[in-house]
Amino acid sequence: MPRPVTLFTGQWADLPLAQLAPLAKSMGYDGLELACWGDHFNVQEALSSPQYVKDKHALLAQHGLQCFAIGNHLVGQAVCDLIDERHQSILPPHVWGDGEPEGVRQRAASELANTAHAAAKFGVKTVSYTHLTLPTILLV
């Protein structure tokens, strides 16, 4: 296969993945970079539930799509940003916690490491975040 053409799903997070997948295929995409928001990819579920991983793979396969990367850009934003109340709306509650900036940064960094582990369980070798892309081998 020549270089695959992929769609990052973050801009489409208001659509359930079950609706977005057939749309992406109809637009000619070979695969997706799943965002870790909306219902596209849940890091904690992927870490704790083999069935979750199987179901996501089945959904993509049903539409002839592959997953080439997992994108956790919103959490990645919190690693180096100056944290303030605006971050609460883009972060999962377990990352935001009490909103204390250093705690948010530490939890965000931990969540990115967990994203790499979840991606590995999903069979994906690339995690992207805040304009950076690293092979999961560097993070796992």
Task: State what each model feature region is.
Residues M1-V124:
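N-terminal pre-domain/capping segments
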Residues T126-S128:
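Short, basic/glycine-rich phosphate-binding loops at helix/coil junctions
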Residues T130-T136:
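Conserved small/polar residues in nucleotide/adenosyl-binding loops
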